[in-house]
Design a protein with these regions (language model features):
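Zn2+-dependent cytidine deaminase-like catalytic core
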Residues: 231-408
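Short beta-strand scaffold segments in enzyme catalytic cores
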Residues: 218-232
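Conserved phosphate-donor/acceptor-positioning beta-strand/loop module used by diverse small-molecule
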Residues: 67-69, 82-105
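Single conserved hydrophobic/aromatic residue that forms the stacking wall/gate
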Residues: 1-6, 10
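Small-molecule kinase domains that catalyze NTP-dependent phosphoryl transfer to phosphate-bearing small molecules
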Residues: 103-175
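Short, basic/aromatic recognition patches
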Residues: 192-218
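Glycine-rich phosphate-binding loop used to anchor ATP phosphates in small-molecule kinases
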Residues: 14-80
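Short, compositionally biased leader-like segments
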Residues: 167-202
């Protein structure tokens, strides 16, 4: 118990130290009261970058592993500076991960909950009236996402996803095989072709860029059992409506465009008052925000009027349901026994649709925080297989699978063949 408590305190102190450095540039136990210094967000990666430059000056051919990055803005720092940078996430089933932390590191269930909250980008606050009390979520400050750990977001933007089964503590063969695969491709791009899982998920990744959602872009692909693509979708408004990214508070208050803004938005007194106040808040920022389109999320604004968290008010279709509807809309074939690929993971509503359609495999990147898996999918006698994505995606997909030169020409060149 003492070892577990010491480990927990150790992690908290290091997490607080990181938050302090990102907020004010140094370690201060009263950092939460300090004024946020935006340039401090990159203090840690700048320090790491200086170490990298020293190592490169000593040895020109240098391979660097940074263990580990848990802030998405630190990822952005290295991506903008190194073309050969790959963000690698190592994932394990949540059940196996928790079992490993409990058995090996002696975490209690409360400590696991604390860890998940602190690493998820959600602000937490410890109740000091109880010893080892779990952290409780509280309202985030405007700067909080810049200074805190957000493992969930880092997984979402990772370039390469590895799977590390934790059910056999000393068996690392699966992880070693994946490391050998991707390190070989980093050193020699194009040695082999992508897996079917990578190929389809890359399509979903590309599709998500069509989304006009202000909060998050998600892509989805439906295939048959052989990974032959039948439909793609992304989260966006229904065809014929204007996406949220192209609408604005200025527009809803002044244009009264019937195609762009709904009857409710043009006429509801309480909604328009809330929209007016938000617009004034933006305009009062002056030159700092000059030139921006003051887009707004209808769901967020409507919920702020109702003092509610209703998810039904979203304007957009989810990526998964959009893909399902494409098949129905254009007269596609049945997909029973097929696969659903999604760059996130299905919510409760989309999970029910996938189950009803007879989807056999759901391949996902980022686990959904709700109860879609435990309540909707893991029940009945036709449960789909849940598969966490393994492979390269996005920019790294092209970097490691595109040949620098045709392999035949490379062999001829190295072999001195004319």
């Amino acid at each position: 118990a003492l070892s577990s408590a010491a480990s927990d305190v150790y992690k908290r102190q290091y997490q607080n130290a990181g938050n302090s450095i990102r907020k004010c540039g140094d370690i201060n136990h009263e950092y939460e009261e300090k004024i946020f210094s935006p340039e401090s967000v990159f203090h840690l990666p700048e320090t790491i970058n200086r170490v990298i430059k020293i190592l490169r000056s000593i040895n020109e051919k240098t391979f660097i592993v940074i263990d580990a990055i848990r802030n998405p803005y630190e990822v952005k720092f290295f991506r903008d500076r190194y073309s050969a940078f790959h963000l690698v996430s190592i994932n394990a089933p949540d059940k196996d991960r928790k079992k490993y932390l409990q058995n090996v590191h002696k975490f209690t269930s409360d400590q696991l909950e604390d860890l998940d909250i602190r690493e998820s980008g959600r602000k937490s606050n410890i109740n000091t009236s109880e010893e080892n009390a779990p952290y409780k979520e509280e309202k985030k400050d405007a700067y909080f996402e810049f200074i805190s750990q957000n493992v969930k977001r880092c997984i979402e933007i990772s370039d390469i996803h590895l799977f590390n089964a934790r059910n056999e503590l000393e068996n690392h063969n699966i992880l070693k095989a994946q490391l050998a695969w991707y390190i070989s491709l980093m050193l020699h791009p194009g040695l082999i072709t992508p897996t079917a899982m990578e190929r389809v998920m890359q399509i979903a990744f590309t599709a998500k860029l069509n989304s006009g959602c202000l909060s998050r872009q998600v892509g989805a692909v439906i295939t048959d059992i052989n990974n032959s693509v039948k439909a793609i979708g992304w989260n966006d408004v229904a065809k014929g409506q204007v996406p949220c990214s192209l609408r604005s508070l200025d527009g809803v208050m002044n244009s009264f465009d019937k195609i762009t803004y709904s009857e409710f938005e043009r006429n509801d007194k309480n909604f328009r008052e809330k929209a007016r106040n938000k617009l004034l808040t933006f305009k009062n920022k002056g030159d700092k925000i000059s030139g921006y389109n003051f887009s707004y999320c209808f769901k967020t604004l409507k919920n702020s009027v109702d003092l509610d968290k209703n998810q039904v008010h979203t304007r957009a279709l989810h990526a998964e349901e959009n893909a399902f509807l494409q098949i129905s809309k254009y007269g596609g074939i049945g997909i029973e026994g097929g696969k659903l690929y999604t760059t996130a993971s299905p919510c409760e509503l989309c999970a029910k649709k996938a189950y009803q359609l007879g989807i056999k495999d759901i391949v996902f990147i980022d686990p959904y925080p709700g109860i879609a898996i435990s309540h909707i999918l893991n029940i009945g006698n036709a449960k789909p297989n849940l598969v966490q994505f393994r492979g390269a995606i996005g920019r790294s997909y092209h970097k490691i699978y595109e040949q620098i030169m045709p392999y035949k020409d490379e062999l001829d060149f190295l072999g001195g063949v004319n």
